[in-house]
């Protein structure tokens, strides 16, 4: 007999599958803070992938202490500029913004992305200092500097909020005041060996049919004589008189926000020429500034903004600094 039951094709966890509102991913959750206050995130632009040779330092691994080849992603990470700080208070089971203070030294390129507030640091920072003990969270408003990159063809900075974790709210406020108006390099946030999460907007695929979008089976050869093979055989019951949202249909595929957990930072450096492959990264070009090497792949195409944060489900957090022996610079052209 035919099988009566089978699991549904595709996951409903990410519905509705529509295009992301912005290319800047949203971070809704942050890792628990440590004893010392620190800025808990960063952002960079994806250049491409290559592979490295490193010493396997994972305990009890079959290749522990041996040389292994690891696929890696290269992110170009120019310093982030801290434009403002914002505090949040408890409200209705969550938090809401209670005040913000902007730097006196804003980058002129910021006016390309937003209307720059007229009120500056002075009185606002004092007002926040007076109520800081009653606040719940403190976040920094930072922006990227794509004008420093040759591989990203834009000048408009990407604006985002980055939470300050650790210590108490007063310690966080003092740290935020010291960072306001400054440029923060990635080396002051993460170090080789750090375990992080990455968020980005995936590659857009446009409108795709249900076979590619949901993974349903093709119609059998005999059933396809009606003229259709790459479609579902049933839209649902007579009642209710509408097509349910769970039915796999054609529609937008890709260009969704996705977060991948537990990526390991294998190296951080400032000499991009030492890791750029011959001929440059396809679709990106040459890395000229600071960079980070992450294990595995990250969502999105080249040139896409990638946000990083401390891992919220950290594994293997006790690993030592990675021993990277070789970074492949073989040409990626034609691959």
Curated annotation (Swiss-Prot):
Where do the record's region annotations for Disordered lie? 1-20
UniProt GO MF annotations: rRNA binding; structural constituent of ribosome
Q: Report the GO terms under cellular component.
A: cytosolic large ribosomal subunit
| UniProt signal peptide | none
Q: Which SUPFAM superfamilies match?
A: Translation proteins (SSF50447)
Q: Does the keyword Phosphoprotein apply?
A: no
Alphabetically list the UniProt keywords.
Answer: Ribonucleoprotein, Ribosomal protein, RNA-binding, rRNA-binding
Q: PANTHER family per the record?
A: 60S RIBOSOMAL PROTEIN L3-RELATED (PTHR11363), LARGE RIBOSOMAL SUBUNIT PROTEIN UL3 (PTHR11363:SF5)
> What is the annotated role of this protein in its UniProt record?
One of the primary rRNA binding proteins, it binds directly near the 3'-end of the 23S rRNA, where it nucleates assembly of the 50S subunit.
Q: Which family does it belong to?
A: Belongs to the universal ribosomal protein uL3 family.
- What is the official name of this protein in its record? Large ribosomal subunit protein uL3
Q: Which organism is it from?
A: Methanothrix harundinacea (strain 6Ac)
Q: Which gene encodes it?
A: rpl3
